[in-house]
């Protein structure tokens, strides 16, 4: 009986000790559980794969200066090639001798001529304009206008006046009177329209060859044609890149 009492007391003491230890660890486990719960909530608000995007910085843009001279040279080359194809494919080469892109002296400077045809029927001096849109102008007007829309209007020098200077330069170079020259202005862009009444020597590409072929009376002798072609064939008039650069520079320096 006494042994049973000791055993009972021992069990009670052991139970008390275990309870005391559990009560000490409880706050620690509670704190840990609270922290784990807070971490789970935080993870729900901010997923692990969330990427914070930075606001992109604007790129620096370098604007190139507008070079209208360069653009005009390129357009002139296109128009010149269109005229070249028309002449070489539709005119008799034994009668019509074609020269293109010459830079010749004029009044102490130089002038560039797009296209020249030497024939028994005269010397045709052709100014090609590769312009898109509607063309407005008059024979005596100093400035013509090219219009692409209500808000796009571009003035340009009367090409008849421009080509007159070419004719005068050729007169001096090949020593021929003015009445042996035919000045022609051809607008070569397929989307170009002449919107005002202009003389017949201002035309579109499709009208160019018929205009040339209407001149059928010989006015230049064969020996003179040979002499003129020899002069125009000289390498010194060829528009090489170096001579073209010098010509453009002289144009920019003129008042």
Labelled PLM ranges:
Residues 1-111, 143, 151-255:
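Surface-exposed interaction regions that form or flank ligand-binding interfaces
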Residues 112-118:
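Short acidic loop-to-beta-strand element that houses the catalytic metal-binding Asp/Glu
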Residues 118-140:
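Active-site beta-strand-loop-beta-strand hairpin of nuclease catalytic cores
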């Amino acid at each position: 009986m006494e042994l049973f009492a000791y055993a009972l007391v021992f069990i009670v003491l052991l139970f008390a000790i275990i309870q005391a230890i559990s009560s000490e660890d409880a706050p620690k486990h509670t704190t840990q559980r609270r922290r784990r719960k807070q971490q789970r909530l935080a993870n729900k608000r901010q997923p692990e794969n969330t990427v914070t995007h930075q606001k992109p910085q604007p790129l620096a843009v370098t604007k190139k200066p507008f070079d209208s001279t360069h653009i005009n040279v390129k357009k002139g080359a296109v128009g010149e090639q269109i005229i070249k194809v028309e002449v070489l494919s539709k005119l008799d080469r034994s009668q019509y001798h074609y020269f293109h892109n010459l830079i010749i002296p004029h009044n102490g400077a130089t002038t560039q001529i797009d296209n020249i045809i030497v024939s028994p029927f005269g010397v045709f001096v052709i100014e090609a304009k590769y312009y898109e849109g509607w063309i407005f102008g008059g024979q005596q007007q100093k400035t013509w206008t090219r219009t692409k829309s209500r808000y796009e209007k571009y003035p340009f020098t009367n090409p008849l006046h421009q080509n007159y200077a070419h004719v005068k330069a050729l007169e001096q170079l090949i020593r021929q009177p003015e009445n042996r020259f035919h000045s022609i202005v051809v607008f070569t862009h397929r989307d170009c329209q002449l919107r005002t009444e202009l003389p017949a020597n201002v035309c579109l590409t499709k009208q160019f060859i018929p205009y040339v072929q209407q001149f059928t009376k010989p006015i230049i002798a064969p020996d003179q044609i040979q002499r003129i072609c020899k002069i125009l064939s000289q390498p010194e008039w060829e528009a090489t890149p170096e001579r073209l650069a010098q010509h453009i520079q002289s144009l920019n320096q003129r008042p």
